Structure formats: C-alpha cells, structure tokens
C-alpha cells in the first residue's frame, strides 16, 4: 500500500478512525441503557449480577478474538478486515436491537465486541502501512485521540438517543452507521488487481465490474428477513390466526423450534454453500477460509480460552466484595493451563498466531508491559473519580459525578495529539515517561483530596494533568511497537497491545479495589461509625496505587523504549560528510 499521504489516504484513514471512535462510544453507551435493557429481558434493577454477561460478553468478544483478527489483518489486508469488522459490528447491533431474552442480548453484544475490537489493530496497522516510521507518530496520535473522543462522547450519545427513543434505537443507529462506514471503506479501499489485465489488455480496459451473485443476494435477504421476524415477532403477524402459524413452535416453547427459525437456518446454510461454490460469490468464503487457516485458529482458540478465563474471573466479580468471581480461582487456573499450552503450541506450530521472533526487539515486548500498567492506572480514574464525587459533593447526582470525570477525559485526546507531534522530535520513551510522570503527579494530588475538595475549582488541575499524561503516552507506545516489529505482524502486534491494556484494566481495578477495601475496613476498625472517612481512606489508597502503576509504566518506557527508532535519522553535518569521504578515498 502506498506510503504517500494523499487525499484518498487521509480520507481512508479518517473513515477508519471514525469507525474506531464509534465503536469506542458504543463501549460506554450501554452504561446508560443497561437498566432499560435489563427490564426488557425480564431482569429486575436489583439483579445487576445476573446482567453482568451483557458487559462481560462484549469484553469477551472485544479482547479474546483480537489476536486472531489482528493476524488475519496481516494476512488478508487491513481494509478487508476493517470492512468485515464493521459488518460484524452492524450484525451484532441488529441482534441486540431485536433481542428478546438475556442470551440473545449477550450474543449481540459479543458480536459487537468482536467487530468493534477488530477495528483497532487493523487501523493502527493501516497507519503503519500508509506512513513511514518517522511520520506515523502524528497519525497514531490522531487515531488515539479520536478513539478517546468517542469514549468521552459515548454517554452523551446514549443520553441523546434515549431522550427521543427506546434503548433499541441506540443499536439500530449503530447498525446503520456501521453499514455506511463499511460501504465507504469498501469504495475507498484498494481494489484487487484483475488477472486479465496483462493477458487481455484491450478486453480488460472496456470490461465492467462483474455483477454480484443474484442467488446469494436473494438467500441473504431471505435469511435476514426471517431472522428479523423471528426476533421481532411483530404483533400484526404474530397474533393473526393464519399469518401467525410460522411463529408457533413445533416442539416446546423456544422460538428456535418454529417454522420461521427453520427458514432462517436453511437460508443461512444455503447462503454459506453458495458462497463456497459460486464462481463470483457475494462473500468469498473460500479465500477468507484460507486466510483463517493461515492465521493459526488452533493457537487463537487456546489464547482466547486463556483470555476468557481472565476476563470472566475479573469482569463478573463485584469489586466492592471480592477480587474475582466465586469461581474465579478455577477460571484463572484454567487460564494458566491454557497459557502454558499456548506457549508450547507457538514453539511447534508451522504458522503460529504470533510468528516466532515477532516481539524479539526490546521495545516491542516492552510496549505490552507498558500498556498493561497504563490500563491498570487508567481504570482507577475511570471508576473511582465518579465514586469519589458521589461520596462527597454530588451524593444525589450521577450526572454531576460524571462531569467531574469529564475534566480528565477531555485532556486525553489533547495529550494524544500532542504526544504524536512530540514523538516525531523526541524519543518515544521520553514522551511516554513524561506523560506517565504527569499522571503520577495527578494521582498523588488527588490522593490528598478531602470531603469538600470538589467545592474548589483547583481540582480541575490534577484531573486535567492526569488525563493529559495518559494522552501523551498513547502515540509513543504504539509508535515504539510498530517501529520495532515487521510490517507482516503489525496487525497481531497491535492487537496484543490492546489486549495487554484491557487485561491491565481488569486486573488493575480488582487489585486496587482490594487494596482500598483493606484500608477501608482497617479505618473502620480504628474509628467505628465513620464510614465517610473510611471511604475516603479507601479512595486515597486506590489513587496511590494508580500513581504507582503510572510511575512503573513511565519507568519501563523510559528504560526499555531506548532502542525504538521512531524518528528520522538526523542529517549528517556537511563537515562530517566531507571527512568521511576523505577517509573513504584514503
């Protein structure tokens, strides 16, 4: 792919960044819609623990499938994977919007996670394809900034939609935007070269693009229409004596035993068969299957199991009560076994998921370590700043508590862009280390807050400084990783960095909350009845722990990113060039 930053290149990258931002917004939008979603699937507001799979299902799809998607992006190309991810995201949004019970909601959210997660490594790898090493830090910073803007606007986006529509409207809009972006990327993306151009140039010059396979399109329409009717059950049809017969189960009471479900399954199977056998299929499943086979599905499955155990152990726990879920010990033991098996598999596989030597350079594997500690620190801000606000000044306003966090979040995209520009001029380790020092200072300041600190506007300073520090670290971490790995593994390497950050967030919130809870109960033991004072001690301990994580991330970056060649080589002085030339002649 061309490395010239022309108009089409910028537009292509811009669309990919918008897709990443939209998926990031969807990550947070469900927070507002969750109560209504719970009621729609028959759960009470007090059954948050049973609704946990709605969150963990998305995380599972987002994280566990990332390495496989990143590897496929290396094999098949960035734009095809971006388009496929958007289609999966749109289909997951459709399933979620039409969901009728908890399993269908979780399925839809899982598919949304798979699609949304696949956008990030493909976009980062696309930046590396389009820009040379010395020029990619700024676009990496812009992509990171746009992603963080999406995270900031996610709750606002959800609130606006919920003000005029039900929660399903969020996911209908997600589906529409996903399909529009997929169509735009398809049109802008590189076209495969036609084999007939060399052999028959005259004919190729006047030939028209082949028509899509009509039968495949008809089967797709039938399958989608049947699925929509199956999930929706429109009353006008469902309650009719004759037209309602396709909705009546032939056995039991499950929708999946109705004639309409049979039509959905048969049409889907026929569509898959047609795409495998047709000369010009609607979706080239044979080619995608070959790419999937080369991406090491066995290794990806083992790694997904290892990640799934970690995600389910921590994401389904109540941090206020426990480090991980009641079965978390068994899940983590299973993850450990899967991790050992994965390492053994990588050593023996012919085409491993992570090609041998991919992360041999120190800045490459160091980027994963830094991402882990950045995630562990960041999650403390995202979770505990609103908690602190609700405990103290804004006891009755979740909105005001969220606006306190917004003062930190708005600084992250600013820092991300600034970090991109700075990384073009300074070593990546210095920029990342400086950012993490700022975050450390911000957390240290916040750890001194008392019961009335939010009444003083000076609290905006540590919030903004902390967010700015996190933003500064984003571009140099990605730049160091991409500069220290081969282009053939940029997709899977970027995916591993995202996975490291997400796992760091999950482990971090559980570990820091556990430390905070110990301080809370110790404070209560010393001063019984002073719950607010004990809660402030808990928050203080969490912020101190987050400051330590930030400091560790900065120190690792400063030391281990030293060999990352993220800048252009400085021009040699004219005198030095002349001396070198004379030495060569001698």
Residue positions per predicted region:
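Intrinsic disorder in cytosolic terminal tails and internal cytosolic loops
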Residues: 1-8, 193-211, 282-289, 560-586
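Small-residue-rich segments within alpha-helical transmembrane domains of MFS-like 12-TM solute carriers
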Residues: 24, 28, 97, 113-121, ...
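C-terminal module of multi-pass small-molecule transporters
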Residues: 65, 76-83, 134, 400-573
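Glycine/proline-centered helix-kink
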Residues: 31, 121, 151-159, 307, ...
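Interfacial helix-cap and linker-helix signal at transmembrane-aqueous boundaries
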Residues: 37-38, 72-73, 157-165, 389-390, ...
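Transmembrane core module of solute transporters
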Residues: 11-38, 46-56, 295-300, 312, ...
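Helix-loop-helix hairpins in multi-pass membrane proteins, especially solute transporters
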Residues: 74, 79-286
């Amino acid at each position: 792919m061309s490395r010239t930053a022309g108009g089409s290149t910028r537009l292509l990258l811009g669309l990919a960044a918008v897709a990443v931002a939209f998926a990031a917004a969807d990550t947070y939008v469900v927070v507002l819609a969750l109560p209504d979603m719970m009621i729609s699937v028959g759960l009470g507001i007090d059954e948050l623990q049973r609704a946990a799979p709605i969150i963990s299902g998305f995380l599972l799809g987002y994280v566990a499938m990332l390495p496989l998607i990143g590897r496929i992006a290396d094999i098949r190309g960035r734009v095809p994977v971006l388009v496929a991810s958007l289609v999966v995201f749109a289909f997951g949004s459709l399933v979620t919007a039409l969901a009728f019970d908890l399993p269908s909601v979780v399925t839809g959210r899982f598919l949304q996670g798979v699609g949304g997660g696949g956008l990030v490594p493909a976009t980062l790898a696309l930046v590396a394809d389009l820009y040379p090493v010395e020029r990619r830090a700024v676009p990496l910073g812009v992509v990171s900034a746009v992603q963080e803007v999406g995270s900031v606007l996610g709750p606002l986006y959800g609130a606006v939609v919920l003000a005029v529509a039900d929660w399903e409207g969020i996911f209908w809009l997600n589906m529409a935007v996903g399909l529009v972006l997929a169509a735009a990327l398809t049109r802008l993306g590189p076209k495969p070269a036609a084999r007939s151009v060399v052999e028959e140039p005259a004919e190729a010059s006047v030939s028209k693009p082949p028509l899509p396979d009509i039968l495949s399109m008809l089967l797709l329409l039938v399958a989608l229409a049947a699925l929509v009717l199956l999930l929706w059950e429109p009353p006008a049809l469902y309650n009719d004596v004759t037209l309602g017969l396709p909705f009546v189960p032939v056995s039991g009471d499950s929708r999946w035993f109705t004639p309409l479900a049979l039509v959905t399954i048969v049409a889907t199977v026929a569509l898959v068969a047609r795409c495998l056998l047709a000369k010009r299929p609607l979706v080239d499943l044979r080619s995608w299957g070959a790419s999937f086979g080369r991406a090491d599905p066995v290794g990806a499955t083992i790694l997904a199991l290892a990640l799934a155990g970690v995600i389910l152990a921590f994401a389904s726990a109540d941090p206020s009560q426990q480090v991980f879920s009641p079965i978390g010990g068994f899940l983590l033991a299973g993850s450990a076994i899967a991790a050992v098996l994965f390492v053994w598999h990588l050593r023996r596989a012919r085409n491993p998921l992570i090609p041998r030597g991919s992360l041999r350079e120190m800045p490459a594997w160091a980027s994963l370590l830094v991402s882990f500690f950045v995630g562990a620190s960041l999650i403390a801000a995202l979770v505990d700043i609103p908690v602190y606000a609700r405990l103290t000044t804004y006891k009755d306003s979740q909105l005001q508590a969220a606006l306190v966090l917004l003062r930190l979040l708005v600084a992250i995209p600013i820092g991300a862009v600034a970090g991109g520009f700075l990384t073009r001029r300074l070593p990546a380790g210095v920029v990342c280390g400086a950012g993490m020092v700022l975050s450390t200072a911000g957390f240290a300041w916040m750890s001194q807050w008392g019961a009335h600190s939010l009444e003083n506007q000076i609290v905006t300073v540590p919030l903004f400084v902390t967010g700015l520090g996190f933003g500064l670290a984003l571009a140099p971490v990605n730049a160091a990783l991409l500069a220290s790995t081969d282009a053939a593994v940029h997709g899977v390497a970027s995916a591993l960095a995202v996975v490291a950050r997400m796992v760091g967030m999950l482990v971090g919130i559980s570990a820091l909350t556990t430390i905070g809870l110990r301080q809370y109960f110790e404070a209560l033991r010393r001063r019984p009845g002073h719950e607010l004072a004990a809660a402030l001690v808990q928050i203080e301990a969490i912020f101190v722990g987050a400051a330590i994580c930030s400091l560790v991330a900065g120190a690792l970056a400063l030391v281990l990113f030293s060999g990352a060649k993220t800048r252009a080589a400085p021009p040699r002085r004219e005198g030095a060039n002349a001396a070198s030339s004379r030495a060569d002649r001698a």
